[in-house]
Amino acid sequence: MMTHDVGVRELGLIEYRAAWQAMQHFTNTRDADSGDEIWLLQHPPVFTQGQAGKAEHLLFPGEIPVVQVDRGGQVTYHGPGQLVGYLLLDVRRLGIGVRELVSRIERSLIDLLAGYDVEAVAKPDAPGVYVGGAKIASLGLRIRNGRSFHGLALNVDMDLEPFRRINPCGYAGLPMTQLRDLIGPIDISEVADRLRDHLVRQLGYAQQKTLAGGIEAYE
């Protein structure tokens, strides 16, 4: 069990490129003594294409911008009403490998959904979390010098139509779902509070601390 804390920033609605650049700066400038952070936020509409992304999976983006990024995985969509969590962790210090990190993130999401009486599962061959065959949460990470960035996206209460403009995560016709469609109206801030607790527990931190301020220092 870890004995140090993790800092959590709740950032609201942030442009994707600004958050991405801040993540990179945070990761590139941290040292062995830097604390780990979890950022919880939402993005305006954007498609992001991972390092393994293939152009054929981007069907008709229309007016929504496409950003080529340095995480793993294929194309996905972010938009308001989707809860995004960026995990800026020293995984070497945590003593876990990438697969174990993915498993713990998935378990956090599954436990979160169980709290709403939603039964969800992970798939060993397709990272993410699924409800009845439909995907409700996506994962995409990057590890640099033993430190992680990027993270997860949970569909809470959003417009799912843009997912039909892509092959989500490279799977043609993959159905997507969201928490609102499963349980009715839901406050995304409540979901964020629950998610942070589950992540802290699964990752083994002694406790969490809320960090004031935004990402301006890292841009």
Swiss-Prot record:
<comment type="pathway">
    <text>Protein modification; protein lipoylation via endogenous pathway; protein N(6)-(lipoyl)lysine from octanoyl-[acyl-carrier-protein]: step 1/2.</text>
</comment>
<protein>
    <recommendedName>
        <fullName>Octanoyltransferase</fullName>
        <ecNumber>2.3.1.181</ecNumber>
    </recommendedName>
</protein>
<keyword id="KW-0012">Acyltransferase</keyword>
<dbReference type="GO" id="GO:0005737">
    <property type="term" value="C:cytoplasm"/>
</dbReference>
<dbReference type="InterPro" id="IPR045864">
    <property type="entry name" value="aa-tRNA-synth_II/BPL/LPL"/>
</dbReference>
<keyword id="KW-0808">Transferase</keyword>
<feature type="binding site">
    <location>
        <begin position="138"/>
        <end position="140"/>
    </location>
    <ligand>
        <name>substrate</name>
    </ligand>
</feature>
<dbReference type="InterPro" id="IPR020605">
    <property type="entry name" value="Octanoyltransferase_CS"/>
</dbReference>
<dbReference type="GO" id="GO:0036211">
    <property type="term" value="P:protein modification process"/>
</dbReference>
<comment type="similarity">
    <text>Belongs to the LipB family.</text>
</comment>
<feature type="binding site">
    <location>
        <begin position="151"/>
        <end position="153"/>
    </location>
    <ligand>
        <name>substrate</name>
    </ligand>
</feature>
<feature type="binding site">
    <location>
        <begin position="71"/>
        <end position="78"/>
    </location>
    <ligand>
        <name>substrate</name>
    </ligand>
</feature>
<feature type="domain" description="BPL/LPL catalytic">
    <location>
        <begin position="32"/>
        <end position="207"/>
    </location>
</feature>
<feature type="site" description="Lowers pKa of active site Cys">
    <location>
        <position position="135"/>
    </location>
</feature>
<comment type="function">
    <text>Catalyzes the transfer of endogenously produced octanoic acid from octanoyl-acyl-carrier-protein onto the lipoyl domains of lipoate-dependent enzymes. Lipoyl-ACP can also act as a substrate although octanoyl-ACP is likely to be the physiological substrate.</text>
</comment>
<keyword id="KW-0963">Cytoplasm</keyword>
<dbReference type="Pfam" id="PF21948">
    <property type="entry name" value="LplA-B_cat"/>
</dbReference>
<dbReference type="GO" id="GO:0033819">
    <property type="term" value="F:lipoyl(octanoyl) transferase activity"/>
</dbReference>
<dbReference type="InterPro" id="IPR004143">
    <property type="entry name" value="BPL_LPL_catalytic"/>
</dbReference>
<dbReference type="InterPro" id="IPR000544">
    <property type="entry name" value="Octanoyltransferase"/>
</dbReference>
<feature type="active site" description="Acyl-thioester intermediate">
    <location>
        <position position="169"/>
    </location>
</feature>
